[in-house]
Amino acid sequence: MPKTINNYNRFLPVVHFSQTELEESLCNAVIHNDKKAAEIAIFKLNISDNFTSDLRTNKSYIDDTHNIFIGDSLPLVAVKNNNLDMLKMLLSCGFEPNTPAAANCYTPLWYVTYKGYTNSVRKLLEYPINNINETFGKETPLKSALIHKHTEIAKLLIDKINPDKFLFNGVENIALLAHDQFMFIINEISTDKKISLFKLCSKNITEHQDFILFGKGEAEINNMHINNTYMLDYLDNNHDDSTTIIGSID
């Protein structure tokens, strides 16, 4: 069975590092973009009842073409290689789509968002991702998309994220109002989802305003004022009698 190491970081599951010859073969095949060899290794692991969907690399591969660290999940290795076919194969075989890496907490979704790999983002979002908006010590995938101006990816994420989970980290995500593209993208989602999202933004502005504004430059604060005014006007014109409108940036 795979070697198991307990990791006390609350974000990470128990990590299964590759140990057997078959597991090593699978990891090496994914690292070196050998899809056929990876399929054979997975088939043999399934036959031997020794397959785990949380298999990790047990060594680092750092050279001109690889940036793989010990403890990377195999879907993360695939997206680091920008190998969409390998990613599709791993996900179809049951690998978890968004497990954070042991070394640096990178998730496949965060990585492809950061890199701007739109097709890989779209493929990952076809699978249930419970931690879609967690930060794991970094900016959220959505904030990363906005920072790096990956507009199409930001649209995909906003469309996928349940509004109730959108502000999983309220202080982190409400700062999105400082980005000039945020409202442009928000305008393309449905009215009901927009209202839910704006209500959450409004609540978090009220609760965290001092922290939100701390360290922001004049242009960012100006964007926040403009976007927040638009948001409150939209809510004022579209809310029902049960909606409480709160949240202004002073």
Curated annotation (Swiss-Prot):
ANK repeat extents: 70-99, 104-134, 137-166
Keyword set, alphabetical order: ANK repeat, Repeat
Gene3D superfamilies: Ankyrin repeat-containing domain
Keyword Signal among record annotations: no
One Pfam family it belongs to: Ank_2
Protein name: Putative ankyrin repeat protein RBE_0623
Origin species: Rickettsia bellii (strain RML369-C)
Keyword Repeat: yes
